[in-house]
Swiss-Prot record:
The chain crosses the membrane at residues 9-29. This is Dolichyl-diphosphooligosaccharide--protein glycosyltransferase subunit 4C. It comes from Arabidopsis thaliana. Residues 1-8 are lumenal. Component of the oligosaccharyltransferase (OST) complex.
Length: 35
C-alpha cells in the first residue's frame, strides 16, 4: 500500500504529465501543419 509520500509524488507526477499532454495536444490541434 502507498504511504503519504508516495501518494503525493504520484499525484504530482500525474498532474504534470496530464498538463504536458494537454499542452502538446493543444499545439498539435492548433497548428495546421499537422494533419
Amino acid at each position: 500500500m502507498f504511504d503519504d509520500q508516495d501518494l503525493g509524488f504520484f499525484a504530482n507526477f500525474l498532474g504534470i504529465f496530464i498538463f504536458i499532454l494537454v499542452i502538446a495536444y493543444h499545439f498539435v490541434m492548433a497548428d495546421p501543419k499537422f494533419e
